[in-house]
Swiss-Prot record:
InterPro entries xref list: Trp_repress, Trp_repressor/repl_initiator, TrpR-like_sf, YecD_YerC
Family matches, as Gene3D superfamilies: TrpR-like
Protein name, as recorded: Uncharacterized protein YerC
SUPFAM superfamilies: TrpR-like (SSF48295)
NCBIfam families associated with the record: yecD_yerC
Signal peptide: none
Phylogenetic placement of the source organism: Bacteria, Bacillati, Bacillota, Bacilli, Bacillales
MF GO annotations: DNA-binding transcription factor activity; sequence-specific DNA binding
Top-level taxon: Bacteria
Length: 104
């Protein structure tokens, strides 16, 4: 994994801080303090690009709907094809949570 080069106390602290957040509102507050609006939007955009790629959408449609560049779309697609399956894991879990919430 590329991130292995960064492993250490500071990154562990960051990830453990994120894992400690209890709900969506705490996430909004934490990321508002931690990141710029553009950084948050970029992260959210990449996740949406991954979701759309998994659904089989074209680069053109993804670019039009998300504003992502073809370079970003290609980078996300490369991660989907050759990465650590983390996009799939996260998107599957979000989908499960949404399904559980809608069935209540």
């Amino acid at each position: 994994m590329q991130i292995d080069k960064l492993r250490g106390k500071e990154l562990d602290q960051l990830f453990n801080s994120i894992l400690s957040l209890k709900d969506l509102e705490e996430c909004y507050r934490f990321f508002d303090d931690l990141c710029t609006i553009n950084e948050i939007q970029s992260l959210a955009q990449r996740l949406e690009v991954a979701r759309m790629l998994r659904e089989g959408n074209t680069y053109h449609k993804i670019e039009t709907e998300t504003g992502a560049s073809t370079a970003t779309i290609s980078r996300v697609k490369r991660c989907l094809n050759y990465g650590n399956d983390a996009y799939e894991m996260a998107l599957d879990r979000v989908k499960e949570t949404e399904t559980e919430s809608s069935s209540k």
